[in-house]
């Protein structure tokens, strides 16, 4: 699923593959160990917030189908978050949790200690702020661990290029890597993709997606508490800061970017966008609360994405495709159930229905784990990093277009030299200076479209 017009991108991927094939990580002497079907898989959870806790529970849920699996180590920078996560996981899977005090690791170095506690061939779950993905992935490869990466996997050009190189190194060691774009594992959407490829609604001319609701996660943040460092505050409220997560745009909109581009069978080549901040009072985060993006594919097809994080407004959380012979619902109201359908008209009325995936449907958050663990058990090739990087890049492309007020191309985003948070692999203390510093008023720099054009803040 690659822009066919894009020779520079093809040259880059070829070069990145060559670098990966010709190089080895320092100290990467630990071989990959393929676990037998009845051998216990050990799991380490790095990042113990809500998404990490959910991912760990989904991993443990595979035991009845795919063999024994146990959580043996956890790491987080906040001790209370680790304790809360451990309690929740034990409530559902007590017999599959063996995480004593000496395997509960707190601090920036905790990710290493947690992975060191897992036998080669086990699984590391990364659900920390996305800025740390490449740092943690690099160490997992060195340790010979399979990996689950929560989305997004990158937030800028330099880390995207780095992750593509690491993907090649993971392949070289036979590691299996899943990425938390779970709608790709939705069986209904998989069938919809095949139907669209078969021409059920004709040639796709337009896609559109909406994510409109009130404040979610840590998207909006007020002034920092006086007893907390900027670094810890930014990690705790990572959705508010572009260096940590790509902001709410990257962290929340990536699923619909991914599912729409999947149905098209291509990635867009450019984007232009608008966005703004409203009614924000003393908020100090970097996010806009409304975004509107027009993505363009190489063949001229358009993909329109509208996002709004604002109370009191019309809410919608859905994606659609429109073709020359009809239309399709890609998602209905959130990620699951998808309730995908095709229609012989653009009206999407019941009387025009061609096909609908039978209900109820299985949860893709569980299916993505079954697919990953099956690949580990059967030693099948499985690496979703490249697609995860591409989805992250396209999302970042739309975000940067809104934040700068410019048309941004895929090539430009991939090769952009600006790294939001260089040197994260060197940080060892929570007292380290934050990658983003506040002004004298305690507020952080925000995007200024048309004024700041070469970078987002």
Task: List PLM regions with ranges.
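N-terminal secretory signal peptides and thylakoid transit peptides that target proteins
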Residues: 1-20
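C-terminal helical cap and adjacent loop that interface with cofactors, partners, or active-site loops
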Residues: 16-21, 28, 54, 232, ...
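N-terminal Rossmann-like dinucleotide-binding module
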Residues: 19-96, 260, 453-455
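Loop/turn elements at helix/coil->beta-strand transitions in domains of secreted/extracellular proteins
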Residues: 39-42, 67-70, 100-102, 119-124, ...
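Predominantly a Rossmann-like dinucleotide-binding segment in NAD(P)-dependent oxidoreductases
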Residues: 47-52, 172-178, 183-285, 293, ...
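A structured beta-alpha segment of the ubiquitous adenosine-cofactor-binding alpha/beta core
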Residues: 92-126
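Beta-strand-loop-alpha-helix segment that lines the small-molecule cofactor/substrate pocket
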Residues: 134-185, 199
